[in-house]
Amino acid sequence: MEIAVIGNSEFILGFRLAGIRKTYTAENDEKLLESVNSVLADGQVGILVLNSSDMERLPRRLRTTLENSVKPTVIALGGEEGGLSMRERIKRSVGVDLWK
């Protein structure tokens, strides 16, 4: 399983420096949609990381799909994230509450 990161060039830079190879620069809405669909079609991606502001720019239907996705598990970073907490996302993806 691999990690994929989608965002503007500043957002993905740190992930690139940390060794994440699957990074997608999405400076506009069209590129963002294209990148998200590409990652969803890639069976090797287990975790998708994107900026919460980019998550809000996605169409409601796609956002709901991402919020309910188990593979890849979608993590939105930055700002106040609506929807499920990190604990709930991990619990959903592995099937166990790791905090208990």
From Swiss-Prot:
SUPFAM superfamilies: AtpF-like
Chief place of localization: membrane
GO terms classed as biological process: proton motive force-driven plasma membrane ATP synthesis
KW Cell inner membrane (keyword) present: no
This protein's GO CC annotations: plasma membrane
Protein's membrane topology: Peripheral membrane protein
NCBIfam families attached to this UniProt entry: PRK02228.1
Family named by the database record: Belongs to the V-ATPase F subunit family.
Name recorded for this polypeptide: A-type ATP synthase subunit F
Species name: Methanoregula boonei (strain DSM 21154 / JCM 14090 / 6A8)
Upper classification of the organism: Archaea, Methanobacteriati, Methanobacteriota, Stenosarchaea group, Methanomicrobia
Encoding gene (name): atpF
